[in-house]
């Protein structure tokens, strides 16, 4: 007898379940997506013990006809595609025909369904075997219950995490589905406790408010753009609202939530230097494209996709976000702590978005100082023409107490987040769900006006003083502004150096002692392949031995003391990417030089020097954050100040 044999259907389903049904969240995802494909407008999700004990999905969709009920639980049985051409034009969330048989093979499943024009069907399946099938009275739609998940695969059950972790995975996937389909009303219950309720009115901003809180919804910027191949819609938060994880960014492709690192990276690139290092925005982007441009048949879980025009899409996303930020005033407002409001007061105020039209400044015209000398060289870094004598003046004799001095190196984090999510993610406790949004509150979001769109210009600022040799105070008719002088000049210097090193030239700096690069054989061969490309960006390598190169000269724009670091970075790019990203290298060099050349904390300036600094800041393309993403300016509105002093109540 031969050794190779065909596996029976039951064992095949168990093997397939290993890919499709990894945990309770996988079951919820597959069943809810089936409900959406069935044109449901209302879906209820009931969980017990984070789905390990029981998962019940109730929808008002098209239902399943009696003759299709048994077939639906056979492998690769589906109503969503008919031939191979349909595989490349997929518009539905499901299409593989694997989910239902995989789920049924590792659980006790009960199905009640009806198309509305005939008696319903009641079906019970245990471990893939049909136990009972009968007609029953049922409303239109489907009610499917999955109990004792993984009862017959104890090895899989052993690897399940805690209740909180599994519940976190489920809520995360439900949140993403709610964002991708705001036209569907979703209710999520755990042990009879309601965790989420979306209205299903099609307003994704209401869904985001229900998930992340009203406060976050107030800080969202609408994103919308269209090209020949792509349409992008969504919301992203202002740069002042960030998180420590990428998990708060959601990308939707043709109505399907996907996990795609390059899309996340494109969103980050759209923010560019607006985000601090290691911080990420809260965002939701829905991308529509011809199904021929995206391959969703990559993995049974259908969370991964491939794009045929990936680079064009990434550039389009980056440019769309950058254009959106140019239309928005990005100076963060300082929060004001006030007395706790009554419930009625807070309900009235939490749905009011500030919207003020820009007014002409009422301050008198002030003649700024002119005729300043050219900047002097500080070490190897040439200074931009920003009131150069500011940065060379000796420090004053008086110094503030040491406890008040804040060295630049000590500021390693952005300001405290303005809000905390009501809807927790995996690592948070589920007590956050206790105070839930009522539907009436969410409906009021429809009338909320958009975030103030004043353009990307910094308003005129009139300095009134300096604190601790670090912060500049200025005012205009909108209130009080605090400016970090180091961050301000760092932004000015960065844009100067970025433009200075922006063009590829043949000017090179000869090295007194050649720099030797030792590589593995594989790395050596890859670099050797790209020698001509390296010459185009001004780096000339000579072979030195079997697996080494030497560098005798480098481009003149390399910052002093960082030459070997940039050369090593170029080698790593060639080895990993098989190309040199000169734009990224020059940007990093500009950041290095700008930080080194800028004034530090605890350096006192004259009024003329402060005026010059603020005027130069106004000429930059982004006067709101330093190249590392830290804020330059914080705003206290006149109204906030009056509230602090109880002039208004």
Swiss-Prot record:
One of its GO terms (cellular component) is mismatch repair complex. Residues 342-360 have a biased composition (Basic and acidic residues). GO terms for molecular function: ATP binding; ATP hydrolysis activity; ATP-dependent DNA damage sensor activity; mismatched DNA binding. Keywords: DNA damage, DNA repair. Residues 388-402 have a biased composition (Low complexity). SMART domains: DNA_mis_repair (SM01340), MutL_C (SM00853). Disulfide bonds: none annotated. PROSITE patterns: DNA_MISMATCH_REPAIR_1 (PS00058). Residues 339-414 are annotated as: Disordered. GO terms for biological process: mismatch repair. This protein is involved in the repair of mismatches in DNA. It is required for dam-dependent methyl-directed DNA mismatch repair. May act as a 'molecular matchmaker', a protein that promotes the formation of a stable complex between two or more DNA-binding proteins in an ATP-dependent manner without itself being part of a final effector complex. Belongs to the DNA mismatch repair MutL/HexB family. This is DNA mismatch repair protein MutL. It comes from Bacillus cytotoxicus (strain DSM 22905 / CIP 110041 / 391-98 / NVH 391-98).
């Amino acid at each position: 007898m031969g050794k190779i044999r065909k596996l029976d259907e039951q064992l095949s389903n168990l093997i397939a379940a290993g890919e499709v049904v990894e945990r309770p969240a996988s079951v919820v995802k597959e069943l809810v997506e089936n409900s959406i494909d069935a044109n449901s407008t209302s879906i209820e999700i009931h969980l017990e013990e984070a789905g390990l004990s029981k998962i019940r999905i109730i929808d008002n969709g098209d239902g399943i006809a009696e003759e299709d009920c048994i077939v639906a639980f056979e492998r690769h049985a589906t109503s969503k595609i008919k031939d191979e051409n349909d595989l490349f034009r997929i518009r539905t969330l499901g299409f593989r025909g694997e989910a239902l048989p995989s789920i049924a093979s590792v659980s006790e499943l009960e199905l009640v369904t009806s198309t509305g024009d005939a008696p319903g069907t009641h079906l019970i399946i245990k471990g893939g075997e049909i136990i009972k099938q009968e007609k029953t009275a049922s409303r239109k739609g489907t009610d499917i219950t999955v109990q004792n998940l993984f009862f017959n695969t104890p090895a899989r059950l052993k690897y399940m995490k805690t209740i909180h972790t599994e519940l976190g995975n489920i809520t995360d996937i439900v949140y993403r589905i709610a964002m991708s389909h705001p036209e569907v009303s979703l209710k999520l219950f755990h042990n009879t406790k309601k965790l989420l309720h979306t209205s299903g009115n099609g307003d994704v901003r209401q869904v985001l408010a229900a998930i992340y809180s009203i406060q976050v919804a107030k800080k969202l910027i609408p994103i919308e753009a269209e090209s020949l191949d792509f349409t992008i819609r969504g919301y992203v938060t202002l740069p002042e609202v960030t998180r420590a994880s990428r998990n708060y960014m959601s990308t939707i492709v043709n109505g399907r939530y996907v996990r795609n690192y390059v899309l996340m990276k494109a969103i980050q690139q759209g923010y560019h230097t607006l985000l601090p290092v290691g911080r990420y925005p809260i965002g939701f982007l829905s991308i529509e494209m011809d199904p021929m441009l995206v391959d969703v048949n990559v993995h049974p879980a259908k969370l991964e996709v491939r794009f045929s025009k990936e680079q064009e899409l990434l550039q389009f996303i980056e440019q769309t976000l950058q254009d959106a930020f140019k239309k928005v005033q990005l100076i963060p407002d300082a929060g004001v702590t006030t007395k706790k409001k009554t419930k009625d007061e807070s309900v009235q105020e939490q749905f009011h978005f500030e919207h003020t039209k820009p007014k002409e400044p009422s301050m008198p015209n002030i003649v700024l100082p002119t005729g300043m000398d050219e900047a002097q060289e500080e070490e190897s870094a040439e200074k931009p023409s920003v009131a150069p004598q500011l940065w060379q003046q000796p420090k004053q004799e008086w110094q503030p107490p040491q406890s008040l001095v804040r060295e630049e190196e000590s500021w390693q984090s952005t300001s405290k987040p303005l809000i905390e999510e009501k809807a927790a993610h995996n690592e948070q406790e589920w007590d956050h769900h206790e105070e839930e949004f009522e539907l009436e509150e969410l409906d009021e979001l429809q009338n909320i006006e958009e975030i103030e769109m004043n353009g990307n210009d910094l308003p005129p600022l009139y300095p009134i003083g300096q604190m601790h040799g670090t912060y500049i105070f200025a005012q205009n008719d909108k209130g009080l502004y605090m400016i970090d002088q180091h961050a301000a000049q760092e932004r000015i210097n960065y844009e100067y150096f970025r433009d200075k090193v922006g063009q590829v030239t043949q000017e090179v700096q000869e090295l007194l002692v050649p720099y030797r690069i030792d590589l593995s054989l594989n790395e050596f061969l890859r670099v050797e392949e790209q020698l001509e490309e390296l010459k185009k960006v001004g780096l000339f390598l000579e072979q030195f031995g079997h697996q080494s190169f030497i560098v005798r000269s480098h481009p003149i724009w390399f910052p002093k003391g960082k030459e070997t670091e940039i050369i090593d970075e170029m080698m790593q790019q060639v080895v990993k990417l098989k190309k040199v990203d000169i734009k990224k290298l020059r940007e990093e060099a500009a950041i290095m030089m700008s930080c080194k050349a800028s004034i530090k904390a605890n350096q006192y300036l004259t009024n003329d020097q402060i005026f010059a600094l603020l005027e130069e800041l106004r000429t930059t393309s982004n006067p709101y954050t330093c190249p590392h993403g830290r804020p330059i300016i914080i705003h206290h509105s006149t109204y906030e100040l009056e509230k602090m002093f109880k002039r208004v109540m």
